[in-house]
Amino acid sequence: MDASTFLALTLACAPQVHADTAHALVSVESAFNPWAIGVVGGALQRQPRHRTEAIATATALHAAGRNFSVGLGQINVGNFSRLGLTLANAFEPCTN
C-alpha cells in the first residue's frame, strides 16, 4: 500500500489516531501489507499475495490450532472474538 493510500485510509478509518502514529505502527507490524500474516513462533514460506489467499492461509492456520496475527495492524487471532473480528473481515484494511 502506498503512502497516500495509507494516509487516506487512516483519516477515514481512524481519525482519532494521529497519522504519524498509525504510520509507525503499521510500518513495523506489516510493512503496509494488508494481507500480512505473522505466525507466532514460526513463519510462512511466503506471504499471501491477495485477500483470498490470505483468508485461505489464515483459515488453515486456525484449523491447525496455530497462533497468528493478521493484517495491517497484526491483530492476533486470540483477540478476534473480543473485537468482533472474523478470519475474513480482519483482512479489511479499515476494520483492521
Segment roles from a protein language model:
Residues M1-N96:
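Catalytic glycan-binding domains that act on GlcNAc-containing polysaccharides
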